[in-house]
UniProtKB/Swiss-Prot annotation:
Annotated source species: Stomoxys calcitrans (Stable fly)
CDD domains: DEFL_defensin-like
Name assigned to this protein: Defensin-2
Disulfide bonds: 60-87, 73-93, 77-95
Signal peptide annotation: 1-23
Lineage: Eukaryota, Metazoa, Ecdysozoa, Arthropoda, Hexapoda
Function: Antibacterial peptide active mostly against Gram-negative bacteria. Its activity is enhanced by lipopolysaccharide.
Membership in a protein family: Belongs to the invertebrate defensin family. Type 1 subfamily.
Length: 97
């Protein structure tokens, strides 16, 4: 029985050591010469922000099949600092003040 508990530990240790050897940094400094390399804070400010969509119905729609949509909406509103919330008829989470 000890074999079944010791063998997975040995496999994990060997896998970690193998990944550590593969993740070792290279001797050269190829990043500085790469054309997509961004250097400095000023260059980061020039980059365009990524656009993303906000889906307000995700809390109420996705969790409605397990009947936890109102609880999830209330928890979401509590995390936002509100006093709670509920899902309305359009499946949108509405937070209280």
């Amino acid at each position: 029985m000890k074999f079944f508990s010791l063998f997975p530990v040995i496999v994990v240790v060997v896998a970690c050591l193998t990944m550590r050897a593969n993740a070792a940094p290279s001797a050269g400094n190829e990043v500085d010469h790469h054309p997509d390399y961004v250097d400095g804070v000023e260059a980061l400010r020039q980059l365009e922000p990524e656009l993303h969509g906000r889906y307000k119905r995700a809390t109420c729609d996705l969790l409605s099949m397990w009947n936890v949509n109102h609880s999830a909406c209330a928890a979401h509103c509590l995390l936002l600092g509100k006093s709670g919330g509920r899902c309305n008829d359009d499946a949108v989470c509405v937070c209280r003040k």
